[in-house]
A protein has these predicted regions:
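Active-site-adjacent structural elements that line small-molecule/cofactor binding pockets in enzymes
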Residues: 1-126
């Protein structure tokens, strides 16, 4: 691979000791993306065919709970960063190791708005 070739990736991120709450925020954040056919096709190609078929079925019957269930833990772990600081930092390093030269962390918070999420992210990497 060429060193001049740029690979960047936006990664939804939620830092919280309460992993379940952080995962819930990530599922809510990704609902809109999961509803779009272009993202569904991308994730199918990336190996998440069952998840995206389940998403499509949930969307077809407008079942929000089924949609949340369709976004599996495996899928969520692979496409976002969430949980305690150490896990988020470890996940960030994994993205770098995979060849993503510029991971773009897009923060959300379980307990506040965008500014709170940015503060949490800055503290995590201070």
């Amino acid at each position: 691979s060429s060193e001049a070739f740029f690979i960047g990736n936006m990664i939804p991120t939620c830092i919280a000791d309460d992993r379940a709450a952080a995962a819930a925020v990530m599922r809510k954040t990704l609902r809109g993306y999961a509803a779009l056919p272009n993202y569904q096709n991308y994730w199918i190609e990336a190996g998440y065919e069952q998840e995206m078929r389940d998403v499509q079925q949930a969307l077809g019957v407008r079942d929000a709970e089924a949609l949340a269930r369709a976004m599996s833990d495996r899928w969520l772990r692979d496409v976002t960063l969430f949980g305690p600081v150490a896990e988020v930092r470890e996940g960030f390093e994994a993205w770098l190791a995979a060849g993503v030269k510029t991971p773009i962390l897009v923060p959300s918070s379980i307990s506040g708005g965008q500014m709170k999420a940015i503060e949490e992210l800055m503290r995590a990497f201070d």
